[in-house]
């Protein structure tokens, strides 16, 4: 994690020790942080920087809460090492990160290895009511590995099928 001080961060950029990390391939583009689609993927970009500076993680939560009534739904088929998933989801993230959109205290992301040849996938199944949405957040924060609300897997590849065009967001390309 980089220090908040510009001087200290600059020093790391100039004098820091390089390290190897996994690089993902998304069609003809590469990325090393996250590839995502669905609800909230634009929240980090649409939330005003001043709000993020003042409220931190809470800024993401507040912006996301404004959108709960209009969650999208995607019927997808996903193949990955040792398995596949088919169902209706509202958010999917392919990650090589220990923190994304303020999620950093989850058991799953604490154990991410940035140089193991694997990416992590979080797929959030579409809730039908606010209680199900709350259960997603509770189980994710508890570190439950997978369940009725979401799926967390590590894999060397992910292959997606969907009947509609999906707008992916790549970060770290």
Name every feature range the model reports, one short phrase each.
Residues 40-43, 86-88, 99-104, 129-132:
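Short acidic/glycine-rich loop or secondary-structure boundary segments that cap or lie
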Residues 51-58, 99-103, 107-128:
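Gly/Ser/Thr-rich active-site loops/lids in small-molecule metabolic enzymes
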Residues 80-82, 86, 113-116, 123-173:
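ATP/nucleoside-binding phosphotransfer catalytic cores, i.e., glycine-rich phosphate-binding loops
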């Amino acid at each position: 994690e980089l220090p908040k001080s510009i001087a200290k961060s600059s020093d790391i950029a100039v004098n820091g020790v390089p390290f190897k990390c996994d690089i993902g391939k998304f069609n003809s583009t590469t990325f090393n942080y996250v590839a995502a689609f669905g609800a909230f993927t634009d929240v980090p970009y649409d939330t005003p920087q001043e709000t993020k500076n003042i409220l931190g993680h809470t800024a993401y939560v507040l912006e996301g809460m404004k959108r709960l009534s209009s969650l999208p739904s995607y019927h997808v088929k996903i193949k990955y090492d040792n398995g596949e998933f088919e169902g209706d989801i509202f958010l999917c993230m392919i990650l090589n990160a220990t923190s994304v959109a303020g999620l950093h205290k989850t058991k799953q992301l604490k154990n991410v290895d940035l140089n193991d040849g694997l990416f992590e996938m979080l797929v959030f199944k579409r809730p039908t009511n606010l209680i199900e949405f709350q259960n997603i957040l509770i189980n994710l924060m508890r570190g439950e590995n997978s369940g009725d609300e979401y799926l967390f897997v590590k894999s060397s590849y992910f292959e997606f099928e969907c009947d509609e065009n999906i707008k992916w967001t790549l970060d770290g390309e």
